[in-house]
């Protein structure tokens, strides 16, 4: 803490910055269980590599359905899901239509028009030739 006291009050370069090898894998965020401790910092045993992709056969994507139990907990799109009873949607449009048109204006109308300057096209300048 004493060494870096003056660095937080101005712009400077951190020459000891290192790349972070613990990147998100498999297109989702989850806990990485293959880590070990090194100098009180968790370091991953896997390093960066190319992203995994699925093969194309006859213009169709062939997915790999082999996975562990409950490994799809972070999916975004779930097909054939159950109804969520915790949230509601108001679909009664008869009472709530045209709410934008019924909004009251709270600003005062200007009595005198404000002066406007000339357009930039009318403020032409001659080219300086050397």
UniProtKB/Swiss-Prot annotation:
The gene is cysX. This is Putative uncharacterized protein CysX. It comes from Escherichia coli (strain K12). It comes from the Bacteria.
């Amino acid at each position: 803490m004493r060494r870096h006291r003056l660095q937080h009050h101005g712009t400077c370069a951190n020459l000891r910055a290192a790349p972070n090898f613990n990147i998100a894998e498999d297109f989702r965020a989850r806990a990485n269980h293959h880590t070990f401790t090194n100098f009180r910092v968790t370091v991953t045993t896997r390093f960066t590599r190319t992203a995994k992709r699925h093969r194309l056969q006859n213009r169709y994507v062939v997915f790999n359905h082999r996975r562990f139990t409950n490994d799809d907990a972070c999916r975004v799109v779930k097909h054939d899901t159950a109804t969520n009873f915790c949230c509601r949607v108001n679909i009664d449009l008869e009472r709530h239509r045209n709410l934008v048109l019924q909004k009251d204006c709270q600003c005062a109308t200007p009595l005198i028009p404000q002066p406007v300057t000339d357009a930039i096209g009318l403020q032409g300048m001659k080219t300086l030739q050397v």
